[in-house]
Curated annotation (Swiss-Prot):
Gene for this chain: glmM
InterPro entries xrefs: A-D-PHexomutase_a/b/a-I, A-D-PHexomutase_a/b/a-I/II/III, A-D-PHexomutase_a/b/a-II, A-D-PHexomutase_a/b/a-III, A-D-PHexomutase_C, A-D-PHexomutase_C_sf, A-D-PHexomutase_CS, Alpha-D-phosphohexomutase_SF
Active site: S102 (phosphoserine intermediate)
Entry keyword annotation includes Translocase: no
One GO term of the biological process aspect: carbohydrate metabolic process
Protein name: Phosphoglucosamine mutase
Catalytic activity annotation: alpha-D-glucosamine 1-phosphate = D-glucosamine 6-phosphate
PTMs per UniProt: Activated by phosphorylation.
Positions of transmembrane segments: none
Length: 453
């Protein structure tokens, strides 16, 4: 059972356990030990980060830990998470490290790893790293003299990633004549994303491109789609694109300012790939959080859906296991496995823009491929993550609601993998009813598991 690693690496408040410099150094040492093979060549690990103030101290601690084990470090600076995955594989490094807490506020930070092929580490490798740290087994391993590692800065990392992204866009197309509102959340994509869309010919109105270390995700980015919505209407743009702090997810809005979430983007791209016979096994991989409307849209187009637990890592695992090439989450994580190994907000936006260009249809019209069932999501903070089915009062209320919904809706209860939160999601035909039921369930959760005041 992993203790340090959650569903997306190690995460917490910066400078508070486990997100301390001491732990970052230990993670660096343990990871370096595991990724070193028996070969005599020098080993290299890529380290990138987002724009958080705490990124500097954690980066330096990781560098110290890795170099102390005789492994070199390639520093790429602020770069989107998928860019770090891409650089890791393209530079034939042994592993990649991302220092980011994604969509969380600036006070938080996180550390996650990619293996040499650019995919997130499997659970068993993360468990090995944890056990090494707990056992103190490698404390005595101290390379000396010329055996210690050194750090290099890769100055053209952003440029390499920009070229990679542009090459995923159809060569016979460009974005000339399109007006795009782009919100980079004052995060890792603040330089890369504007360059990609501008170099493809679009007129880009940029928001969230002035990071100062404390404004990442602050009233901007994919968690605040109303920002691009207002800007699209003001500038009469064709589309609004909002990334999160590490740019592994994207939310967009159409030319009228209406939000288009990950489910709709997947529906648009998957049905387009079905038409062009490019969707492997005619299958889209999603999570249990995706709206039932997506299932209906895929069936109508002649495709099918495979569902996983929540978390893009589980989507990717299912895609690799089943031989599928498109998957994602309602939150905006989308994986185009023919192009990249992990969720990529900029790449996903480019694929959506390609469908708009190919069909010569506005986003509002393309979005009609899917009609979402009313969905309500309510969160509450909890003091412990106890199995809900063991609390009779809550379990009975959930069963009662499920009986009332029948085959025309569903109840989904799950804990966040990265925060002390419980999420209650209901789908059904009547928004008023499902909202009331969701609030009833959440009130019972607060009664039994809520944080003590």
């Amino acid at each position: 059972m992993k203790k340090l690693f959650g569903t997306d690496g190690v995460r917490g408040v910066a400078n508070v356990y486990p997100m301390t410099t001491e732990m970052a150094m230990q993670l660096g040492r343990a990871a370096a030990y595991i990724f070193k093979s028996s070969s005599k060549r020098r080993h290299r690990i890529v380290i990138g980060k987002d724009t958080r103030l705490s990124g500097y101290m954690l980066e330096n601690a990781m560098v110290a830990g890795i170099c102390s084990m005789g492994v070199d470090v390639l520093l790429v600076g602020p770069l989107p998470t998928p860019g770090i995955a891409n650089i890791t594989s393209s530079m034939r490094a042994d592993a990649g490290v991302v220092i980011s807490a994604s969509h969380n506020p600036f006070q938080d930070n996180g550390i996650k790893f990619f293996s040499a092929d650019g995919f997130k580490l499997p659970d068993q490798i993360e468990l090995k790293i944890e056990k090494l740290i707990e056992s103190n087994k490698i404390d005595s391993l101290r390379p000396t003299a010329s055996e210690v590692g050194k750090a290099f800065r890769i100055d053209d990392a952003a440029g390499r990633y920009i070229v990679f992204l542009k090459n995923t866009f159809p060569t016979e197309m460009d974005l000339s004549g399109m007006k795009i509102v782009l919100d980079c959340a004052n995060g890792a994509a603040y330089r890369v994303a504007p360059a990609v869309f501008e170099e493809l010919g679009a007129e880009v109105i940029c928001l969230g491109v002035s990071p100062n270390g404390t404004n990442i995700n602050a009233d901007c980015g994919s968690l605040y789609p109303q920002v691009i919505s207002e800007a699209v209407k003001k500038h009469r743009a064709d589309i609004g694109i909002a990334l999160d702090g590490d740019a592994d997810r994207v939310i967009v809005c159409d030319e009228f300012g209406h939000e288009v979430d990950g489910d709709h983007i997947m529906a648009i791209c998957a049905t387009d790939m079905l038409r062009r016979k490019l969707l492997k096994k005619k299958t889209l991989v999603t999570t249990v959080m995706s709206n039932m409307g997506l299932d209906i849209a895929m069936r109508a187009a002649g495709g099918k859906i495979v569902k996983t637990a929540v978390g893009d890592r589980y989507v990717v695992e299912e895609m690799r296991k089943g031989g599928y090439n498109l998957g994602g989450e309602q939150s905006g994580h989308m994986i185009f496995l023919d192009s990249n190994t992990t969720g990529d907000g900029i790449l996903s936006a480019l694929q959506l823009l390609a469908v708009m260009r190919r069909t010569e249809k506005p986003l509002s019209e393309l979005s009609e491929v899917m009609i979402a069932l009313p969905q309500v999501l309510v969160n509450t903070r909890v003091r412990e993550k106890k199995d809900i089915t063991t609390i009779p009062e809550i379990a009975a209320r959930i069963r009662d609601v499920e009986e009332k919904l029948g085959n025309e809706g569903r109840v989904l209860i799950r804990y966040s993998g990265t925060e002390p939160l419980l999420r209650v999601m209901l789908e059904g035909k009547d928004t008023y009813e499902i909202t009331a039921w969701a609030n009833e369930i959440i009130d019972l959760v607060r009664k039994h598991l809520g944080e003590k005041q």
